[in-house]
UniProtKB/Swiss-Prot annotation:
Organism: Pseudomonas putida (strain W619)
Zinc finger (FPG-type): 236-270
Cofactor: Zn(2+)
Recorded catalytic activity of this chain's protein: Hydrolysis of DNA containing ring-opened 7-methylguanine residues, releasing 2,6-diamino-4-hydroxy-5-(N-methyl)formamidopyrimidine; 2'-deoxyribonucleotide-(2'-deoxyribose 5'-phosphate)-2'-deoxyribonucleotide-DNA = a 3'-end 2'-deoxyribonucleotide-(2,3-dehydro-2,3-deoxyribose 5'-phosphate)-DNA + a 5'-end 5'-phospho-2'-deoxyribonucleoside-DNA + H(+)
Oligomeric and partner information: Monomer.
Note on how the cofactor is bound: Binds 1 zinc ion per subunit.
Name under which the protein is recorded: Formamidopyrimidine-DNA glycosylase
SMART domains: Fapy_DNA_glyco, H2TH
Single GO molecular function: zinc ion binding
UniProt family annotation: Belongs to the FPG family.
Bilayer-spanning residue ranges: none
Amino acid sequence: MPELPEVETTRRGIAPHLEGQRVSRVVVRDRRLRWPIPEDLDVRLSGQRILSVERRAKYLLINAEVGTLISHLGMSGNLRLVQLGLPAAKHEHVDIELESGLMLRYTDPRRFGAMLWSLDPLNHELLLRLGPEPLTDLFDGERLFQLSRGRTMAVKPFIMDNAVVVGVGNIYATEALFAAGIDPRREAGGISRTRYLKLAIEIKRVLAAAIEQGGTTLRDFIGGDGQPGYFQQELFVYGRGGMPCKLCGTTLREAKLGQRASVYCPRCQR
């Protein structure tokens, strides 16, 4: 599933080619995504100039003169720029055609993504209750410490809660906890302020490094230019259960937390 770095990579790839451009037509070949694509999307967006492309959590916000297209890549989706007129292949559900001669093509084999229209996106029900962005000053270790008091859940699903902080998905939660030396199974409410301060720093560092590398391509993800990400080469623990720890050589273990597999080092993480 594309996580925050992959979505930010997509945003950075498509924004320069969309901003300031006018939409000539929207072609929807299949409306059946997680929620149906609005039947009048072509009418609403065609003829409008795209003002900006922003990201909120794992949602892309394509802001037009009137209204915003809210897009989510789901489990296997991607948005990429192609030349106008390029024939569509299987699973290529939407084309946003631009007067520049390019079009933004949405591909989603599993159809768990979304394309919705809103006149007030930040108050849309999907975005309204989201926590702070992890790479801003609104997120820090003090926030983690305060919100964790009295919480008996494991720390990994705690930091993956979008009400606590957005965009810390399975890959990057696993890596940040390893970097901070915290066992993902530990009770969130039992971790000290000092360790949460360290964890917040590592969350920011890991996410920033992943964005710099263009995200992590494990299976489906490609950026807006059609290229894969390279952060998978930097992974210390995610997907390496049963293999030796890169730092100490201890065999990495796996645990199930919140229906997700979690890999950790029993020696490096306490």
